[in-house]
Amino acid sequence: MFYVNSRAIIERTVGDRAEIIVQTRNKPGGPRRIELPGGRIEPFESLVAALVREVKEETGLDLVEIEGEETRIETAGINPDFEVECIRPFAAYQTTKGPIDSVGVYFRCKAAGELLESGDETLRPRWVAVEEIRRMMAQDPLQFADVDRAGLLFYLKHQG
């Protein structure tokens, strides 16, 4: 099986401290690891629509800004039988080894609303300081979900 994912790095600044949302994966039979909101896109669902849906299901938040959305081009109206969307995400990933074959994109976002206590197969969506994520990653990178470990390392290197 091959999957395509759309994932969110939801940011805010409190004072001079940058924070992002992480949550704990709570999928039956799977390990409980720290992850970013997001998930699989449905057939013919756009990356942005999947991102908005997954963030709402998992965190309860509404996305109010998606970095790169201004680059979005779609071909709707040109050929009624075939539509394509192109957009510039923050980062893209591809698994190159492991039990799940997937590709996906990360978008930097801003959100509004109240966090859920638990969402769709997730627990404790919460704001964490970026510097704390950096410390946690250095201390024990395996506490993060396999895919998001790479996404977070990329973010920590290129967040500027």
Feature map (PLM): residue ranges:
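Nudix hydrolase/Nudix homology domain
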Residues: 29-34, 77, 88-91, 99-160
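The catalytic Nudix box helix
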Residues: 36-81
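Short, flexible active-site-adjacent loop segments at beta-strand->alpha-helix junctions, enriched
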Residues: 14, 26-27, 72-75, 113
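A short catalytic or substrate-binding loop motif that flags glycine-/basic-rich loops and adjacent residues
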Residues: 1-3, 98-101
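Active-site donor-binding loop signature of nucleotide-sugar glycosyltransferases
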Residues: 25, 38, 130
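N-terminal strand-loop-strand
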Residues: 1-35, 63-64
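Short, flexible, mixed-charge acidic loops at enzyme active sites
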Residues: 26-27, 79-84
